[in-house]
A protein has these predicted regions:
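N-terminal beta1-alpha1-beta2 module of alpha/beta enzyme domains
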Residues: 1-70, 74
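Conserved, mostly hydrophobic/aromatic
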Residues: 3, 48, 66, 97, ...
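Hydrophobic faces of well-ordered beta-strands that scaffold small-molecule active sites
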Residues: 3-5, 44-46, 75-77, 105-109, ...
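An alpha-helical appendage that flanks or caps ligand/catalytic pockets
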Residues: 5-7, 38, 129-162, 205-305, ...
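Active-site mouth loops of central-metabolism enzymes
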Residues: 13-26, 80-87, 170-180, 280-289
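Internal, glycine-rich beta/alpha segment that forms the wall or movable "lid"
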Residues: 15, 86-193, 212
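Acidic (Asp/Glu)-rich catalytic clusters
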Residues: 37, 63-71, 94, 98-104, ...
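Glycine-rich, proline-tolerant flexible connector loops at the mouths of alpha/beta enzymes
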Residues: 43-62, 81, 113, 201-202, ...
Length: 347
């Protein structure tokens, strides 16, 4: 069981209507990941977006900077939008970070729940599924063989070409993030790739059939059962007082849900949704340490995942509040969850 933190680099929205600079948020991110490393948190993931509400469009640059400031923490995308990227270049970038970090780099890829990168990089949304399928196939092949000969529809063919540098130990750990479609789960199992379930709404237990489906598909493709790995990605935020934390964080969280929702036709986000999400059957882990421990243990009992990714900067909370949330997660939440599960801890 591993515990980590993911972020998107949400920009700070100030009460006077101004937005904090990207540079400010990027520098904060590096301080935050340093703290995670010092606390012994297992992994850090940073996402890719091309919108005004997020500071990070190139996760690999943030991870390269983080590699020079950290010693032990695993560094990953969360996620890299593979459909609008070149798998060759993506592998090279993350293999470079892997070399820089002495083997601490992972690559998590997804189709992308935001579509801004498709027109930005010249891809047709009508090819959404086909792009991801072809590019995942190429990425996996690059990770497994060098040199490589390959031909597809959406990029130039490769003819006995070397892809360099190679990752440490000539292998990059690649995860696939899915939003909940059976097809995505089967695809990950077919390629023998570990999978993250992005659970950002509803009742998380509803994902249990997909967990089971993944393991069933994994067995169907005759992979070793011991190698199957699953993770969950869940919105989290921690404070010393549960009620105060919820009350203070709700306006920021709701504002970001509404910024995203305004582009997707969602109705305005309401407090009752937030409160339901914080409850036993909801998909938010927001509150004090006791609430967090209880919720994570319940989710683990129901879903049986190997990794828990606490997504922690939705809405751009203040840097000081994020540092406190990270400290509570690393110093109190993780050790207590591990103890309850009988997992040895060095924290």
């Amino acid at each position: 069981m591993e515990f980590g933190i993911s972020m998107f680099g949400d920009n700070h929205y100030h009460s006077n209507g101004t937005v904090g600079s990207a540079g400010e948020r990027l520098r904060e991110l590096l301080t935050e990941v340093q703290l995670m490393d010092e606390l012994g948190i297992n992994f850090f993931g940073i996402g890719e977006h091309h919108r005004t509400d997020y500071a990070v469009s190139t996760p690999e640059i943030i991870l390269a900077a983080a590699a020079t400031r950290t010693k032990n923490i695993q560094l990953s995308s969360a996620v890299a939008v593979l459909s609008s990227a070149d798998p060759v270049r993506l592998y090279q970038q993350y293999a470079t970070i892997d070399q820089l970090s002495n083997g601490r780099t992972e690559l998590t890829v997804g189709r992308g729940s935001f579509i801004e990168s498709f027109p930005l990089y010249g891809y047709n949304l009508n090819d959404y599924e086909a792009l991801f399928e072809e590019k995942l196939d190429l990425l996996v092949r690059i990770n497994q063989q060098n040199p490589i000969t390959w031909k597809g529809k959406y990029r130039a063919a490769l003819n006995n070409q070397q892809i360099l540098p190679r990752a440490v130990n000539d292998y990059l750990n690649i995860w696939v993030a899915v939003g909940g479609t059976p097809e995505s789960v089967v695809r990950a199992a077919r390629y023998a790739l570990p999978v993250y379930f992005a659970i950002i709404g509803g009742n998380p237990v509803q994902f249990k059939p997909l967990f089971d489906y993944y393991h069933k598909a994994w067995a169907h493709y005759e992979h070793s059962a011991k190698q199957a790995q699953t993770g969950v990605h869940i919105h989290c935020f921690f404070g010393k007082n549960g009620t105060a934390t919820a009350n203070n964080y709700y306006p920021l969280y709701a504002a970001q849900m509404n910024r995203v929702g305004s582009t997707r036709g969602w109705p305005p986000y309401q407090r009752h949704q937030f409160d339901y999400g914080r409850g036993k059957n909801g998909a938010l882990v927001i509150g004090d340490v006791n609430e967090a421990v209880e919720k994570i243990l319940y989710l683990h009992e129901q879903l049986g995942f190997n990794r828990f990714a606490a997504h922690m900067d939705v809405g751009g909370p203040a840097h000081a509040d994020l540092l406190q949330s990270i400290e509570l997660f690393g110093n109190e939440v993780i050790p207590r969850v591990k103890k309850a599960l009988g997992i040895a801890t060095t924290n």
